Structures are given as structure tokens and as C-alpha cells.
């Protein structure tokens, strides 16, 4: 069913990120302001040389006029997109549009570069510069923000490294897997408890006897069925495994850390609850925090509220001083003045000297 105009208007007016015009968005990005400035200068040179060449008696390639007009339109659109901070929304358009402009300019350069006269030489120099800039734009805007070249270029921007849609999608996918895994743990706990209860009832064990869920065990440390009752009837083992089950149900995110492949994900008496994790190592974002030093100092540019679904993030206020141990990647490991340790987004803070934070 096609929605009415009123419903469509209500959908458009729904909750979404609103972007306001700000020239600082363009000026604060060295890559954007430099490439756009060079393109505008090259465009003026091309236009002047083309007008001067068209007054000569010699023929002038007419298709070049359309390339000049198209390049001017592309420059105007890019300035608007940057001023409204819509670059991440239109990266595909900018990349494809720059590719088309690259073809137009290289075609014009082929027709002008071998022509005689200083006027056509100026026009050919302008279209060659435009072709180079367009090729750089295709390479930059065609790549993800997490690519090495984009991260290096964005590191000079006042806004910092832009968030990566690919990495964000990967994190959301892992969080959905975390929720599914926690539900599977709860279902497995209930099934094994019911199975063990049925076994005890079948063997004539008192119904009021405390039983142990196998979720907290490896399930393979005792393969002798004759010794099952002696292990399960231990009061210490009952209490320990009940606590493990409660901890897994209350903290499914922490439980997921120990559920990766080729890693023992169950708690035993010998491990004492200390298991390894590989999901954080794979992402490069989440890892166990030890007693490592924090040699860098950073000041919060904006306030940040940690995600409740991610136990590794920490919140901070604007202007707060943080100690940082690793400045590689989009998430940095940091330590607050209160001693709280966690990860923070790098584009919300600015590195400073130690004496500046005093």
C-alpha cells in the first residue's frame, strides 16, 4: 500500500540527524580546502584559456565547454556537501562524479595539448590539473574511512578520523551475535538443569537436593558415570556453578568474550574463571586491560556517553583530562583521573602535552 502524503511527510519529519550550514566544516578539513582550491584555480585557467582560444580562427573542441560546465557544477556541489557535513552520505556520488569529470578533462587535454598557441596551452594545462585532482578524489572518496590512505589524510583534519561504516556494521553484527549467544546460554542452562533433575529423580535422589548445571563445567573432565553423583553432590561445586550460571545470565556480554573458537569457554576449578578472549583481538578495539603505562595525555573536545551495551567504553565530559596508552586506531585505551580504564573514540579527544593538562 502506497503511503499518503501526510504519512510520507510524517516519515520525513521523523527522528534523524539534522545538518546545519557551517563554513568551518570545509575550512577545518585540509584535504578538502586544498583540493577544492586547486580545482577552482585550474578551472579559472581552463575557462580563460578556452575563451581566448575560441576567439582564434582555429577550431576549438566544442565538447570541452560541457566538461568545463560539468566541473563547475561538481565543485559547487562539493562545497555544499562539505559545508553541511554530508560527505559520508554522498561519498559514492562524489567518487562517481569525479570519475566522469576525469574522463571529460582527459578527453579535452588530448585535443588541446598538441595544439599550437599559448592560449590553448593554458587551457590544456588547466584541464590536466583538473584531471589529476579528479583522480585523487576518485581514490579518496571511493575508499572506506578505515582504509590506510583515508586514515592518514583525515588525521590532519580538525574533526579527526571519520567513522567507518564498515567497522560500525561489524561491531553491530558482533553485538547482535552477543545477544543471540546469551540467549543460547540461557536456553542451554535450562535444558541441562532439567536433564540433570530428571536424572536425579530417576536414580531416586531426593527432589529437595541441590543440583548443578553443566554450563559451568567442561562436560568432559569426568567420563565415569559411577562417579557422577559424588561430583554433583559436592556442596562447594553446587555453590560455585550456581554462581557461574547467574553471572553468565546477568552479564551476557562478558560471557561472549570467552566463547570464541579454539578457546576453552567454560569455567572449571583449575581455570578459576580466567579464560581467554579472541573477539577483542580480532576487532582491535576490545582487549583485556592490564597494568600497562599511559604515556600520552589527551583533553576531551566533546562530552561522550558510553554505550550501555558495551562494557569497555567509558564516559567523559568536555575538557576532562585523560591518560592514553595507545593512539593507533579509531578507539584508544585510556585511563581517567578516577582510575577507571576503558576505550574512548579518538575523534572526541585531542592529544596535548603533559604540562598543558596541569
Swiss-Prot record:
Domain (SH3) ranges: 293-354
Recorded superkingdom: Eukaryota
Extracellular-side positions: 52-62, 107-120
Keyword annotations from UniProtKB, A to Z: Cell membrane, Membrane, SH3 domain, Stress response, Transmembrane, Transmembrane helix
A GO cellular component entry from the record: plasma membrane
GO MF: MAP-kinase scaffold activity; osmosensor activity
SMART domains assigned: SH3 (SM00326)
GO biological process: establishment of cell polarity; osmosensory signaling pathway via Sho1 osmosensor; signal transduction involved in filamentous growth
InterPro entries noted in UniProt: SH3-like_dom_sf, SH3_domain, Sho1_SH3
Side Cytoplasmic, residues: 1-30, 84-88, 142-358
Residues passing through the membrane, by range: 31-51, 63-83, 89-106, 121-141
Membrane topology, record value: Multi-pass membrane protein
Subcellular location: Cell membrane
Family indicated by similarity: Belongs to the SHO1 family.
Assembly and binders: Forms homooligomers.
Described purpose of this protein according to its UniProt entry: Plasma membrane osmosensor that activates the high osmolarity glycerol (HOG) MAPK signaling pathway in response to high osmolarity.
Name of this chain's protein: High osmolarity signaling protein SHO1
Organism: Vanderwaltozyma polyspora (strain ATCC 22028 / DSM 70294 / BCRC 21397 / CBS 2163 / NBRC 10782 / NRRL Y-8283 / UCD 57-17)
Name of encoding gene: SHO1
Amino acid at each position: 500500500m502506497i503511503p499518503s502524503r501526510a504519512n510520507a511527510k510524517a516519515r520525513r519529519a521523523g527522528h534523524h540527524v539534522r545538518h546545519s550550514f557551517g563554513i568551518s566544516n570545509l575550512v577545518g578539513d585540509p584535504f578538502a580546502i586544498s583540493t577544492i582550491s586547486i580545482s577552482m584555480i585550474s578551472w579559472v585557467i581552463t575557462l580563460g584559456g578556452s575563451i581566448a582560444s575560441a576567439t582564434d580562427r582555429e577550431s576549438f573542441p566544442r565538447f570541452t565547454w560541457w566538461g568545463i560546465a560539468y566541473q563547475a557544477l561538481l565543485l559547487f556541489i562539493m562545497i555544499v556537501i562539505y559545508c553541511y557535513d554530508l560527505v559520508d552520505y554522498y561519498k559514492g556520488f562524489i567518487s562517481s562524479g569525479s570519475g566522469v569529470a576525469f574522463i571529460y578533462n582527459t578527453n579535452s587535454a588530448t585535443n588541446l595539448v598538441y595544439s599550437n598557441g599559448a592560449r590553448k596551452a593554458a587551457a590544456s594545462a588547466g584541464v590536466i590539473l583538473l584531471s589529476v585532482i579528479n583522480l585523487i578524489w576518485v581514490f579518496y572518496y571511493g575508499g572506506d574511512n578505515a582504509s590506510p590512505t583515508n586514515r592518514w589524510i583525515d588525521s590532519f583534519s580538525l574533526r579527526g578520523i571519520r567513522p567507518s561504516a564498515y567497522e560500525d556494521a561489524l561491531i553491530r553484527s558482533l553485538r547482535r551475535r552477543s545477544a543471540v549467544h546469551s540467549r543460547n546460554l540461557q536456553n542451554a542452562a535450562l535444558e541441562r538443569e532439567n536433564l540433570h533433575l530428571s536424572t536425579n529423580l530417576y536414580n531416586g535422589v531426593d527432589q529437595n537436593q541441590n543440583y548443578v548445571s553443566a554450563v559451568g563445567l567442561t562436560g568432559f573432565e569426568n567420563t565415569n558415570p559411577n562417579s557422577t553423583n559424588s561430583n554433583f553432590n559436592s556442596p562447594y561445586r553446587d555453590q560455585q556453578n550456581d554462581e557461574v550460571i547467574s553471572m553468565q545470565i546477568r552479564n551476557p556480554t562478558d560471557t561472549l568474550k570467552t566463547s570464541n573458537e579454539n578457546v576453552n569457554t567454560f569455567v572449571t576449578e583449575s581455570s578459576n574463571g580466567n579464560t581467554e578472549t579472541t573477539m577483542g583481538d580480532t576487532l582491535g578495539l576490545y582487549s583485556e586491560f592490564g597494568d600497562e603505562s599511559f604515556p600520552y595525555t589527551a583533553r576531551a573536545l566533546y562530552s561522550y556517553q558510553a554505550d550501555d551495551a558495551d562494557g569497555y567504553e567509558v564516559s567523559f565530559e568536555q575538557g576532562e583530562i585523560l591518560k592514553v596508552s595507545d593512539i593507533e586506531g579509531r578507539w584508544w585505551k585510556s585511563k581517567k583521573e578516577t582510575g577507571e580504564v576503558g576505550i574512548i573514540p579518538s575523534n572526541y579527544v585531542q592529544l596535548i602535552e603533559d604540562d598543558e593538562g596541569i
